[in-house]
Amino acid sequence: MPDDRDLAIVLPAYRPPIGRLSEYIETLDTQLDPDRIHVPFDGIKDGDPQLRRLEQAGATVSPSPDRQGKGAALSGTFDRLATSFDRLLFLDADGSASAESAVHLAEQVGGSSPTLAIGYRHPPQQAERRNRTGCRRVFSSGYRRLAHALVGIDARDPQCGAKAMDASVWWQLRPALRNTGFGWDTELLAIAAAAGIPVSEHPVEWVDQPGTTVRLTDPVWMLGQLLSARRRASKTPPRQPTPSSQTSRLRVANRD
């Protein structure tokens, strides 16, 4: 895959550990040499000294005193960046995804055929034993099965915070995308399935960071997000018409 097309990385953040995020920005800048690293930063006022630390690390920052939500932050930022950059990559701001995996994911887009490249969490064995709780494993497995059954998403890890796409793919998906929160990932994939967007799936070396927890209320909330994603996808016209009796499925063209 060519790597000479403009790349923008987006790290949506809400009250992140500034030291860890600054180090992550520096690592991504060194490893990927992107044209832009942007942090839509919720819960902070303009002029806060923390913003300067992120800028010194190599990022541009758009602060918001309110919590607009992950989906709103990503959609708004992609809308701006997709007019100037050919490739878009988003990663969780806590640095859970390794920079090496981010390099591989970014290399999957920018070719002759526009595509969406998604990661699935692949923790190092020791890190998985240490950091990934039984609750998180059960939740992830159950959510994946529900996403498959309700929305037609066959991906290993729909909620993985590592996804890359061509800017042209973003503009195809954007009109139907409405989710402003953590269900943004699932709605994105559901719309991609309905539209027939080619998708590739790749392992991402992942270490869960302290403070990223699964609330007991999440399964009920996520079910609502899945049903919303299904409704949104049903309104998305496919690239090629399919029989009305046929359920749209996320077409994973390649798996690592």
Where do the PLM segments sit?
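Hydrophobic targeting segments
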Residues: 5-11, 25-28, 35-40
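Conserved catalytic loops of nucleotide-sugar-dependent glycosyltransferases that act on lipid-linked
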Residues: 73-74, 131-234
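A conserved acidic beta->alpha catalytic loop
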Residues: 41-49
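Acceptor/aglycone-binding surface of glycosyltransferases and processive sugar-polymer synthases
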Residues: 59-60, 66, 72-76, 80, ...
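Terminal disorder- and signal-encoded targeting elements
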Residues: 1-6, 240-256
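Short, high-confidence coil segments that cap the C-terminus of an alpha-helix
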Residues: 85-86, 113-116, 197
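Short beta-strand-to-loop acidic/aromatic patch adjacent to the donor-nucleotide binding site
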Residues: 85-96
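Short, well-formed alpha-helical segments that are part of the catalytic scaffolds
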Residues: 15-31, 47
